[in-house]
């Protein structure tokens, strides 16, 4: 179907339909890992079913959050969408849904697994029939000393929702944001090494490294 951006009520219903169908797809894939390996012999013995990560970009990030414990709420009628999926061990997001009205006021509260989020100062969400600047709102309060699980936040100066057209869409204004994408990619790999591979060097890098110094002020990293 085509998203109806001229009717907020219908658009929210469509978005929840998308996330609901996608979360079911994710659970179905987990249920089918053995069959998938049988269909694709090259994957045999390469899938670690004990280390599973939910990952996504934009609305895909909303779906990843949904299967990691967060609740989406339709602001028009209060309908709540949740998931009883418990098999994901970590959550990785590039450009979360920011201040989308479906997001709860404090979305970090529902997620109980190690979380990584990368966004940029020029990130935005498409709302209604036009574009609306969307500040980074997934970030937990500064006065919160520690959350229920480690939440890593990377903010990249100048990065937009599509990295200048390098990811997701190619029909957006450039220029390509190679440096911004490289920062997000490198930090994502470090996060996965730390929490999926239990690599102590990667964990030390996340906890004690200084991304701002390393990138000459281009990006910052915080942990709660």
Give the location of each predicted region.
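Active-site-adjacent alpha-helix of alpha/beta-hydrolase-fold enzymes
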Residues: 109-185
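Extracytoplasmic/periplasmic, Sec-exported soluble proteins
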Residues: 14-22, 83, 176-184
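Extracytoplasmic/secreted envelope proteins and their assembly/folding machinery
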Residues: 23, 27-30, 65, 185, ...
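Primarily recognizes the serine-hydrolase "nucleophile elbow" in alpha/beta-hydrolase
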Residues: 29-110
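Alpha/beta-hydrolase active-site loop
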Residues: 2-49
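Alpha/beta-hydrolase-fold serine-hydrolase catalytic core, especially in secreted/extracellular enzymes
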Residues: 156-162, 166-224
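Active-site machinery of serine-nucleophile hydrolases
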Residues: 1-9, 150-153, 157
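Structural recognition of the beta-strand scaffold that forms the well-ordered cores
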Residues: 51-55, 90-94, 115-119, 152-155, ...
